[in-house]
């Protein structure tokens, strides 16, 4: 009997436990289970999880996509955490620390934690690795999974490529082996733990700006300029934090940025579109119907940039629109009116 079997109560080895049963967490669980691996999916809402188990589908977020037989729906957190050595945390960034605290009492001695959460710590703008270290100490290997991924396309088995990074090289290799488990889901290894976390947060903010630009009606030229200069801002902040420049030309940087800024499956882009069309922040968020990570990310990235002394004019203007009531058109005008300078 394997080590995994000794720890779980399912009578069969569990390859991975996914913590978080929203659209992205569910899609990752489906993708992992589709190739025959036993995958546990845990969510905090017992009624929601009961529907998932009864329907063998997540009709709320991923209608029409059936669960593989090897996907195990679980409501008992202790059973879920102890079922597998490897945990994949897929929750909104503002509850990331809370969720880790709930996991901590149930962790195995050999547990390893990867997250696909994109964002920074609320109110501080700290990287999620710092939150994880505060909660868990240095006892467990940590990793981050990031890249251009829409939940529906992943769950449907459409071709997707992402990256995984960790200070623990063996953990990266193991995750790459476990997640890169089909002909349509490719996983690249990355050594830049900091850059991988940062890209996922900043791209959400720039996507709001791209949506605002399109909502106003500025067109493709303006959208492309925002993406390009947004990448420059992401890279400057990354350099200040010690990230590797090439990370931002990869899946977790340019890849995720282009995806989120150009396709209306992106909640952040749709949120920006609504703002550009004149809706207020509260109405725009309500109309989306799901968490708009970029709203909180904007404040977090803005705080981090201020703390690091990094100039991020696009982030600055989006922050003023979201948190200070500035008109989106005026924000665009102020960006265009900035002093002439060298491109860098």
UniProtKB/Swiss-Prot annotation:
SUPFAM superfamilies: 6-phosphogluconate dehydrogenase C-terminal domain-like (SSF48179), NAD(P)-binding Rossmann-fold domains (SSF51735). InterPro entries: 6-PGluconate_DH-like_C_sf, 6PGD_dom2, G3P_DH_NAD-dep, G3P_DH_NAD-dep_C, G3P_DH_NAD-dep_N, NAD(P)-bd_dom_sf. Its EC number is 1.1.1.94. It catalyses: sn-glycerol 3-phosphate + NAD(+) = dihydroxyacetone phosphate + NADH + H(+); sn-glycerol 3-phosphate + NADP(+) = dihydroxyacetone phosphate + NADPH + H(+). It is found in: Cytoplasm. Keywords: Cytoplasm, Lipid biosynthesis, Lipid metabolism, NAD, NADP, Nucleotide-binding, Oxidoreductase, Phospholipid biosynthesis, Phospholipid metabolism. One of its GO terms (biological process) is glycerol-3-phosphate catabolic process. Pfam families: NAD_Gly3P_dh_C (PF07479), NAD_Gly3P_dh_N (PF01210). It comes from the Bacteria. Catalyzes the reduction of the glycolytic intermediate dihydroxyacetone phosphate (DHAP) to sn-glycerol 3-phosphate (G3P), the key precursor for phospholipid synthesis. This is Glycerol-3-phosphate dehydrogenase [NAD(P)+]. It comes from Vibrio cholerae serotype O1 (strain ATCC 39315 / El Tor Inaba N16961). The gene is gpsA.
């Amino acid at each position: 009997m394997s080590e995994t079997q000794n720890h779980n109560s399912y009578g069969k080895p569990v390859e991975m436990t996914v913590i978080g049963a929203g659209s992205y967490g569910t899609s990752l669980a489906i993708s992992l289970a589709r190739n025959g691996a036993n995958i546990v999916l845990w969510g905090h809402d017992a009624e929601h999880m009961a529907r998932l188990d009864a329907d063998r589908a997540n009709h709320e977020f991923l209608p029409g996509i059936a669960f593989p037989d090897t996907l195990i729906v679980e409501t008992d957190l202790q059973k879920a955490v102890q079922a597998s050595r490897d945990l994949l945390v897929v929750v909104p960034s503002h509850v990331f620390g809370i969720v880790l605290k709930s996991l901590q009492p149930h962790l195995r001695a050999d547990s390893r934690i990867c997250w696909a959460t994109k964002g920074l710590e609320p109110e501080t703008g700290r990287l999620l690795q710092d939150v994880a270290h505060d909660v868990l100490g240095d006892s467990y290997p940590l990793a981050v999974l990031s890249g251009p991924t829409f939940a529906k396309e992943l769950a449907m088995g459409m071709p997707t490529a992402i990256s995984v990074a960790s200070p623990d090289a063996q953990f990266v290799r193991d995750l790459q082996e476990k997640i890169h488990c089909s002909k349509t889901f490719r996983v690249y290894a990355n050594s830049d733990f900091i850059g991988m976390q940062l890209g996922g947060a900043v791209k959400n903010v720039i996507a709001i700006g791209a949506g605002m630009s399109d909502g106003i009606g500025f067109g493709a030229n303006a959208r492309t300029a925002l993406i390009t200069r947004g990448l420059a801002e992401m890279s400057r902040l990354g350099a200040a934090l010690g990230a590797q420049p090439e990370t931002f030309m990869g899946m977790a940087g340019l890849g995720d940025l282009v995806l989120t800024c150009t396709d209306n499956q992106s909640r952040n882009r749709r949120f920006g579109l609504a703002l550009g069309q004149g809706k207020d922040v509260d109405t725009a968020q309500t109309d989306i119907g799901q968490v708009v990570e970029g709203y909180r990310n904007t404040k977090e990235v803005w705080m981090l940039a201020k703390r690091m002394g990094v100039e991020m004019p696009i982030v600055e203007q989006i922050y003023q629109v979201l948190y200070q009531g500035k008109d989106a058109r005026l924000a665009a005008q102020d960006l265009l009116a900035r002093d002439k300078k060298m491109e860098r």
